[in-house]
Regions:
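Conserved GNAT-fold acetyl-CoA-binding loop/helix
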Residues: 26-27
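N-terminal nucleotide-binding beta1-loop-alpha1 segment
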Residues: 13-17
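Active-site-adjacent betaalpha module
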Residues: 2-11, 33, 37-40, 44-45, ...
Length: 187
């Protein structure tokens, strides 16, 4: 249960699903399709969809900076512009969530080992419950620089987040097919 008072609502947070971020990402098409399914489920359940866009993914308004063509933000859905891996750092994400009485986050997007991890930890540290959708996040292959392969990065993140906890807050993972936004609070 979130430690945030009077914040019973859930939001789907879609992080950095931009051409320049996921263009070469592992399992890109399946992950984007799973995110599209989550967006449809959230909208059908009248759950807020909050978009996060990395301003470092290329020049603003460039092709690389744009959200992928398979996903479309609706008018009125918040768009958070960020410069740091944690989507809360120096952005209006917290105020957007507070306005909507959100205390539970369902997180999807990219990059697993950067912005996904940082935002999940930032959410828990700020009092949110945070659920990672296990098959709806991805990363690029950085193994030539000594990183594990993307499938291992994703699997490791899913493993440790499925067991993460903090006083008064919940964390966990769920597959996109099992997300049910009609069950309060969260999935």
């Amino acid at each position: 249960m979130t430690t945030l008072i009077n914040r019973p609502n859930t939001a789907l947070v879609v992080i950095d699903v931009q051409n320049g971020v996921v263009g070469e990402a592992y399992n890109r098409d399946n992950v984007v399709a799973n995110i599209a399914s989550l967006i449809d489920k959230a909208r059908a359940a009248d759950v807020d969809v909050v978009w996060v866009q990395d301003s470092g993914a290329g020049a603003r308004d460039s092709e690389g900076w744009q959200l992928v063509s398979e996903l479309s933000r609706r008018e009125g859905e918040p768009l958070v512009q960020k410069d740091f891996a944690d989507s809360f750092e120096e952005t209006d994400l917290e105020s957007i969530l507070a306005e909507r009485s959100v205390g539970q986050l369902v997180v999807a997007g990219a990059q697993t080992d950067e912005c996904i991890r940082s935002t999940l930890h930032g959410a828990i540290a700020r009092g949110y419950d945070a659920t990672l959708v296990a098959d709806a996040h991805t990363t690029e292959d950085l193994s030539e620089w000594g990183a594990p392969t993307p499938d291992l990065v994703i699997a490791h993140t899913n493993l440790y987040w499925s067991n993460h906890a903090a006083p008064g807050r919940t964390a966990g993972t769920v597959n996109s097919a099992d997300v049910d936004f009609t069950i309060a609070p969260g999935v």
